[in-house]
Amino acid sequence: MPGAVEGPRWKQAEDIRDIYDFRDVLGTGAFSEVILAEDKRTQKLVAIKCIAKKALEGKEGSMENEIAVLHKIKHPNIVALDDIYESGGHLYLIMQLVSGGELFDRIVEKGFYTERDASRLIFQVLDAVKYLHDLGIVHRDLKPENLLYYSLDEDSKIMISDFGLSKMEDPGSVLSTACGTPGYVAPEVLAQKPYSKAVDCWSIGVIAYILLCGYPPFYDENDAKLFEQILKAEYEFDSPYWDDISDSAKDFIRHLMEKDPEKRFTCEQALQHPWIAGDTALDKNIHQSVSEQIKKNFAKSKWKQAFNATAVVRHMRKLQLGTSQEGQGQTASHGELLTPTAGGPAAGCCCRDCCVEPGSELPPAPPPSSRAMD
């Protein structure tokens, strides 16, 4: 981390609803919620992360430093922290609001999708994560549902959400960070070894794998066997799903999904790989195969995530704000930072009367042998 950062002293508000009109609950976690809201002064739509202060007891000092660092993050592919309020028993983090929806939805809706499209997506993720790493920030939970489109425009950029405040968690609780999405976690995290920025590079490799075939590289109904696969870095480029994918793409993934974190590519090295920086990413249309597998393996009925990007798209289309210009305060949304809970609104949440089904962990996909194409 950078050295101790001054500030920012959050603003005091007697009632946050005097400033913001709460519209909808976008996500819920153990001690927090993400709310879609409108600034009553500017009519700007934002995402407000409401954090129960009791969840931060004993961590106030580190919290101030972490939020100060978040406040300084300015990158075109990372959601921004605009403001902070304290009111009653909660902190309110005012975040940008993304309006473009989820990564998988966009891919499925496209009629044409290529390796080059996937390469452009991964380039944006690598560039943003390199920026975080240069600041000493490790995301630790990169996954497709944390990649959201900035706007409804066809050429919209991708945005990384849901990062940074994980640093406020007990650094010894490595497994608690991974349990919600085991398929994306680096081997050293599962082995409960000290880990570094390299864990993010592994996760980017997993995301690249999924973007090129539509299913995750690791699967087993039994968590222990799933973890064993990850610990050994056992994955395949299965036929026929990878037959039309370039050797360069596979080489890129192998360098990121390298078991040894010391040998694993850094973001800087990955950005220099020919599949990203060169012209080796193919232009062949792989939409049918990839979209079919995404629909099978990441179906909405099975995948209930903590952040509801669909609700944002619905609101944006209703208000005809989905294509706001970047320079005019177009907003992007921050996903859920804390581990989701089951069974109702978040404990200690700021809107207990809101009826929202909390997110649950991403289910594993069927093994390659049972993924016969229709």
From Swiss-Prot:
<feature type="domain" description="Protein kinase">
    <location>
        <begin position="20"/>
        <end position="276"/>
    </location>
</feature>
<keyword id="KW-0539">Nucleus</keyword>
<dbReference type="GO" id="GO:0098978">
    <property type="term" value="C:glutamatergic synapse"/>
</dbReference>
<feature type="active site" description="Proton acceptor">
    <location>
        <position position="141"/>
    </location>
</feature>
<keyword id="KW-0808">Transferase</keyword>
<keyword id="KW-0547">Nucleotide-binding</keyword>
<comment type="function">
    <text>Calcium/calmodulin-dependent protein kinase that operates in the calcium-triggered CaMKK-CaMK1 signaling cascade and, upon calcium influx, regulates transcription activators activity, cell cycle, hormone production, cell differentiation, actin filament organization and neurite outgrowth. Recognizes the substrate consensus sequence [MVLIF]-x-R-x(2)-[ST]-x(3)-[MVLIF]. Regulates axonal extension and growth cone motility in hippocampal and cerebellar nerve cells.</text>
</comment>
<dbReference type="GO" id="GO:0007399">
    <property type="term" value="P:nervous system development"/>
</dbReference>
<dbReference type="GO" id="GO:0005829">
    <property type="term" value="C:cytosol"/>
</dbReference>
<dbReference type="GO" id="GO:0060143">
    <property type="term" value="P:positive regulation of syncytium formation by plasma membrane fusion"/>
</dbReference>
<keyword id="KW-0021">Allosteric enzyme</keyword>
<keyword id="KW-0418">Kinase</keyword>
<dbReference type="InterPro" id="IPR000719">
    <property type="entry name" value="Prot_kinase_dom"/>
</dbReference>
<dbReference type="GO" id="GO:0051835">
    <property type="term" value="P:positive regulation of synapse structural plasticity"/>
</dbReference>
<dbReference type="InterPro" id="IPR017441">
    <property type="entry name" value="Protein_kinase_ATP_BS"/>
</dbReference>
<dbReference type="GO" id="GO:0046827">
    <property type="term" value="P:positive regulation of protein export from nucleus"/>
</dbReference>
<dbReference type="GO" id="GO:0035556">
    <property type="term" value="P:intracellular signal transduction"/>
</dbReference>
<feature type="region of interest" description="Autoinhibitory domain">
    <location>
        <begin position="276"/>
        <end position="316"/>
    </location>
</feature>
<dbReference type="GO" id="GO:0045944">
    <property type="term" value="P:positive regulation of transcription by RNA polymerase II"/>
</dbReference>
<keyword id="KW-0723">Serine/threonine-protein kinase</keyword>
<feature type="binding site">
    <location>
        <begin position="26"/>
        <end position="34"/>
    </location>
    <ligand>
        <name>ATP</name>
    </ligand>
</feature>
<keyword id="KW-1017">Isopeptide bond</keyword>
<comment type="similarity">
    <text>Belongs to the protein kinase superfamily. CAMK Ser/Thr protein kinase family. CaMK subfamily.</text>
</comment>
<feature type="cross-link" description="Glycyl lysine isopeptide (Lys-Gly) (interchain with G-Cter in ubiquitin)">
    <location>
        <position position="59"/>
    </location>
</feature>
<comment type="subunit">
    <text>Monomer. Interacts with XPO1.</text>
</comment>
<dbReference type="GO" id="GO:0005737">
    <property type="term" value="C:cytoplasm"/>
</dbReference>
<keyword id="KW-0217">Developmental protein</keyword>
<keyword id="KW-0597">Phosphoprotein</keyword>
<dbReference type="GO" id="GO:0051149">
    <property type="term" value="P:positive regulation of muscle cell differentiation"/>
</dbReference>
<keyword id="KW-0221">Differentiation</keyword>
<keyword id="KW-0963">Cytoplasm</keyword>
<dbReference type="GO" id="GO:0043393">
    <property type="term" value="P:regulation of protein binding"/>
</dbReference>
<dbReference type="GO" id="GO:0071902">
    <property type="term" value="P:positive regulation of protein serine/threonine kinase activity"/>
</dbReference>
<feature type="region of interest" description="Calmodulin-binding">
    <location>
        <begin position="296"/>
        <end position="317"/>
    </location>
</feature>
<feature type="short sequence motif" description="Involved in nuclear import">
    <location>
        <begin position="263"/>
        <end position="264"/>
    </location>
</feature>
<feature type="binding site">
    <location>
        <position position="49"/>
    </location>
    <ligand>
        <name>ATP</name>
    </ligand>
</feature>
<dbReference type="GO" id="GO:0004683">
    <property type="term" value="F:calcium/calmodulin-dependent protein kinase activity"/>
</dbReference>
<keyword id="KW-0524">Neurogenesis</keyword>
<dbReference type="GO" id="GO:0006913">
    <property type="term" value="P:nucleocytoplasmic transport"/>
</dbReference>
<dbReference type="GO" id="GO:0050807">
    <property type="term" value="P:regulation of synapse organization"/>
</dbReference>
<feature type="short sequence motif" description="Nuclear export signal">
    <location>
        <begin position="315"/>
        <end position="321"/>
    </location>
</feature>
<dbReference type="GO" id="GO:0030154">
    <property type="term" value="P:cell differentiation"/>
</dbReference>
